Amino acid sequence: MIRPADDYDLYEDNKPFSIRKDKVTLRLLNKELIPPWNPNIIIRNIFDMGIYYVTGDENMIREEDIEFNNISEEKLYEIAINKMIKEYDITISPAETENKIANAFLLNIENANECNSAPNNCVSLIYPGILKNFAEKQHSNLYILPLNIEYVYIFTETDIKRKCKAENKSKKEVLIAMEEYLQKQIEDYDNKVEIDILSRYRIPILSYKILYYNRTYNELYALKNGKIDKTAGKYELLPENKQKEVLS
């Protein structure tokens, strides 16, 4: 079980505040780590993760804040997505994992500054067109290992199948091994917290689940025991052509 974070600054008061549209940023985090003291914090669910909103002064946006500003959560999401696309460069580049699962790629926001109310690295997972363009270029659907908020690894389904053939294993066996690897990282993370409580604030765990991206439908699915977990639902990503001027 991931320990919930408790180091975030509490609001000095509960009064709603004016939201500056040019300062709204998205963050992605495991829902267990999102501060629990204010149930009104706006969270957009994506499996066991939560997308939440912060402003330039690092305040998390709540229900009362969007009501005060007469803005919907949907509009806030659109504003934050488009703002970040304009301000940050996102890349997918070759990488290696510790146990060399397969040929890996890593999502990265090149010029993000976490201290300046920037998005965390993992939120690039939901940027319009990012996974779609990469998947089309690779001619393959994708498997995603959301190791933590800084390291989100991508594997092509084509390469996973190639690994299965080379090692004479079923795809289910390889995917279960990926799930076990992720679980081991979570256990190591929790054990490290026992030794160094600050470690959980450096690179928090993101998800318990391996994800599958279908490029035809532009949707994410969660895996369980090497197969798509139909009970977990799906998360539909925005198409690239949804980007538009919304900051005015």
Language-model features: where?
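Serine/threonine-rich low-complexity intrinsically disordered regions
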Residues: 4, 20, 25, 30, ...
